[in-house]
Amino acid sequence: MRSERGLSVAENKDTGFRVITSVIKPAFKMHFSPTIIGSENIPKDGAVVIAGNHKNISDQFLVFLATKRVVNYMAKREYFDGALAPLFKWAGCIPVNRDGFDAAAVRRAIKILKRGGAVGIFPEGTRNRTDKSLLAFKPGAAAIAKRGGALIVPFAISGEYRKNGNLKILFGEPFSPESMSVEEATDKLYSAVSDLLNSQ
């Protein structure tokens, strides 16, 4: 399958994995020194949506520290036009137009899942710049997981985004949204992420 940027999903995965393992992972580990808890909850294979809170542009790359799997993150299209564009492209991120429903991005995410891949989604839909621990969740993560036949693994990032900032990345137990409505699965995901944040 060809992506809209001219690279196949497989090519994006291979390139992104090499870049992240050789450069980004060591740099992020040294700069943030995060504590990773519950990474064993991420399935080693099979379709999975990894979804959690979003406060910093580094979040999707921090999640890469916790898993050897390639996670194709859904990211706003503007990132693909700026200085960080090569990083997002090489990592196999999926560009999303947030002005409305982006059917092409959803189809691409579902195809990745149906091939047994992993997709990362921030269900808040944007970075949380408020004093609230979480913004309301949009239904996209649950809907994509259901249509892609995927498990959902909740995660939470807490602490300060700096060295010695006690940054933690926590993963909860996976659950299947198959027998749930999209609304029920979204509520369960929100509760799981909230519980992870409150556990710290």
Describe each PLM feature range.
Residues 27-29, 66, 88, 112, ...:
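A generic structural signal for well-ordered alpha-helical segments
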Residues 2-38, 82-91:
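A transmembrane-helix-recognition feature enriched in membrane-embedded lipid enzymes
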Residues 22, 29, 43-100:
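Catalytic core of membrane glycerolipid acyltransferases/transacylases, capturing the structured
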Residues 32, 99-103, 134:
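A conditional alpha-helix N-cap/helix-loop micro-motif detector
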Residues 32, 71, 167:
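Small-molecule pocket liners
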Residues 2-15, 104-200:
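Non-catalytic C-terminal accessory region of glycerolipid acyltransferases
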Residues 40-42, 110-111:
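Short amphipathic alpha-helix with an adjacent loop that forms part of the alpha/beta core around
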Residues 36-37, 94-97, 177:
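Short acidic-hydrophobic, aromatic-tinged amphipathic segments that line or gate anion-handling sites
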